[in-house]
């Protein structure tokens, strides 16, 4: 009986720990630097997608524990704002949506370096809009789950 109660309690704690602790980053709808608009930002509960004039493509900032856990990132840094330096500091270049897992596997050493830090995925293929970028996260959930066993914080 005690073992059963202990097991139920552990499952309860695991469920609480897996819930995202930050619902919103409260980001503005655009990022300005030096008087120039660099990015348009779409905020979601589990990620922030933004298109950028600074670099080509759509960036997806993994801001919440839910998506970070898909990638095996136990602790993801949460920022209230971006800087130009941060846009290119910790990113993975994915050649295409179809080659997501192969490209990521090729960058596994780089992924291990960033496993406990800020994580940005930079996609070469442009989305039609920011909504499509967020759909990308949902459609590739299985690929993220596959990666979660390979990238862990120590």
Can you annotate each of these PLM segments?
Residues 2-7:
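Sec-dependent signal peptide recognition
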Residues 20-31:
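Short, low-complexity, disordered segments immediately C-terminal to signal peptides
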Residues 14-15:
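C-terminal motif of bacterial Sec signal peptides marking the signal peptidase cleavage site
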Residues 153-154:
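Short, solvent-exposed mixed-charge patches
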Residues 10-11:
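Short, linear, compositionally biased motifs with a strong N-terminal bias
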Residues 26, 41-149:
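Conserved polar/disulfide-associated segments of primarily extracytoplasmic proteins
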